[in-house]
Amino acid sequence: MTTTSAKPTSEANPPNKRGADYLSQRPFLSCGEIGTEYGLQRPKESLFHRNFMGMCENARRKTSAVFGGLSMVYEFCAENFERVPAAIDAGARRIELCDNLAVGGTTPSAGVVSATTNYAHEHDARVMCMIRPRGGDFHYNQDELRMMEMDLGLAVSAGVDGLVFGCCKPCAGGWALDELTLGALVMAAGCATEECKREPIDITFHMAFDQLSPEAQLDAIDILADCGITRILTHGGAAGTPIEDNFENLARLIEYAGDRLTILPGGGISTVNRDTVAAALGVSELHGTKIVPLEV
């Protein structure tokens, strides 16, 4: 995808118009350019960044208040609604809602999002909605980005507790974090919550993270934390490898992230090894399709 950096607005104040019309016309912004749009030299001090970080902190406090009695948060990766009730009954307190798990998960339909969110909230569980327009790689063109912005707006208006997305771009020797697309999606999420006048949402950066080199992963943690991302879902190594083989790298990522964001281990975690993984890594959140006991 070829994009150009946004130019600072010539207006004294940022545009007030929000929503689909504004998003369809606004230029792409990297995380570093979000502050520039608001006429500030330091992105960390931008009005949007302060508000968004404050909203994320409030969301974390709310999570602690609601589920503070639980020692672990098991996030069940669901393909549509079918197994959500059973997963919640089995102890899942957070649902990552997807479609098409055969290709790694794509955006579920608006009807599925609404029904799942309503059910989960009635049963003291939270919903993270996947925002991914297709399978394959995580490098999106401008049309796909617009689709993602519209989809996340619909998900926020349906009441989801968080969004799950990720984006990379080709670089010499592999993949790099796509800061322009990331910035646009983070901005769209913030605009959507403001427009709906609702409580803040979490954002998980999904396993696109695992496409990055070990060195690039540390740089990505800095950028993602700076953007207000809540957590990173990662297997810690190549897909298909036993997660136990990735403990060393996962521990490295957890230590580096500190309290800036949560490293959420996933992939190859089940009821058989979840306690071992949690103890080895010292984590309180785990993700998977087999993370809670379900009948086959």
Predicted regions mapped to residue ranges:
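Catalytic cores of alpha/beta
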Residues: 82-84, 139-151, 212-226, 253, ...
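Glycine-rich phosphate-binding active-site loops on the catalytic face of alpha/beta enzymes
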Residues: 96-105, 158, 164-171, 229-242, ...
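C-terminal alpha-helical cap/extension of soluble enzyme domains
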Residues: 132-136, 239-243, 248-296
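Hydrophobic faces of well-ordered beta-strands that scaffold small-molecule active sites
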Residues: 74-76, 95-97, 127-131, 163-165, ...
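Hydrophobic, well-structured mid-protein blocks that either form specific transmembrane helices
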Residues: 156, 160-212
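Active-site-adjacent beta->alpha loops and helix N-cap segments on the catalytic face
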Residues: 82, 102-119, 170-188, 212-218, ...
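Glycine/small-residue-rich loop that forms an oxyanion/phosphate-binding "nest" at active or ligand-binding sites
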Residues: 125-178
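Positively charged N-terminal leader segments that act as targeting/secretion signals
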Residues: 13-29, 59-60, 64-65
